[in-house]
Amino acid sequence: MSEQQIDLQHQANVIRKLTLEEIGKLGVGHVGGSLSICEVLAALYFRLMKIDPHNPGWPERDRLVLSKGHGGPALYAALALKGYFPIELLDTLNRPGTMLPSHCDMRRTVGIDMTTGSLGQGFSAAVGMALAVQMDHLPNTIYTIIGDGESDEGQIWEAAMFAGGRRLDHLIAFTDYNKMQIDGYTQEINPLEPLEDKWRAFGWHVQSIDGHNTDEIVSAVEQAKRAQGKPSMILLNTIKGKGASFSEGKLASHNMKLTEEMWKAAVAELEKEGA
């Protein structure tokens, strides 16, 4: 089956199912912020990114920096589904000796382009990669996903100012805008609005879309690639914990315990939908 024939929403649901299984078998993890990014991961890995799972170090590949590194379980699910490593390894999430720590580590996991978890730093690394692409006239596109809670970090805005000033148009960023963070609602903790205007003021091309609609994600990236002379920010309006009744839209889903009954029921629901 060609990449154009792959049902991206189906792939997103499979990623969501695998994510629930790996966190569920461990018993605890970052459920909310992993389940909210399954659609963008499906679009990137199964349609948009120029990558080769059989040659993960390919110099001309596109890169993804998951700056909100606590979403690692979803990224691992996408990588396994794409063929970077066996799906069975997902059962080792965050266990002794694993190659799949709770937060992304480029030295331990094949397919991970940057170690992340200290909020704000991954985004800065992605900006640095995009600068290298520009300076060396390379064909790579650099993608990065940041969190809305992560957007409280001053380092995000320092990097945003630099990227806009340097006109890094090989950089496409996404914000997982689920309106929740570990301490509460983003609007109550540190209001981000007007978020679109903020990014435009820093010299970015900005779009705001449904982050759970794979067609909109693909279209937004295609439009971003046509925006010459500007880095692009795509605000993904998402729901934290999407796809499981015990986590969807719930603040407690940021990092939560899962019983076997909980995660198996959620997986069964996804399987009914064809995952």
UniProtKB/Swiss-Prot annotation:
Its EC number is 2.2.1.15. Gene3D superfamilies: 3.40.50.970. GO terms for molecular function: transferase activity. InterPro entries: THDP-binding (IPR029061), Transketolase_N (IPR005474). It catalyses: 6-deoxy-6-sulfo-D-fructose + D-glyceraldehyde 3-phosphate = 4-deoxy-4-sulfo-D-erythrose + D-xylulose 5-phosphate; 4-deoxy-4-sulfo-D-erythrulose + D-glyceraldehyde 3-phosphate = sulfoacetaldehyde + D-xylulose 5-phosphate. Keywords: Carbohydrate metabolism, Thiamine pyrophosphate, Transferase. It comes from the Bacteria. It holds the Pfam family Transketolase_N. Its cofactor is thiamine diphosphate. It is an enzyme of class 2 (transferase). The keyword Transferase applies. SUPFAM superfamilies: Thiamin diphosphate-binding fold (THDP-binding). Part of the sulfo-TK pathway, a D-sulfoquinovose degradation pathway that produces 2-hydroxyethane-1-sulfonate (isethionate). Catalyzes two steps of the pathway: the formation of 4-deoxy-4-sulfoerythrose (SE) and xylulose 5-phosphate from 6-deoxy-6-sulfo-D-fructose (SF) and glyceraldehyde 3-phosphate, and the formation of sulfoacetaldehyde (SA) and xylulose 5-phosphate from 4-deoxy-4-sulfo-D-erythrulose (SEu) and glyceraldehyde 3-phosphate. Forms a complex with SqwH. Belongs to the transketolase family. This is 6-deoxy-6-sulfo-D-fructose transketolase subunit SqwG. The gene is sqwG.
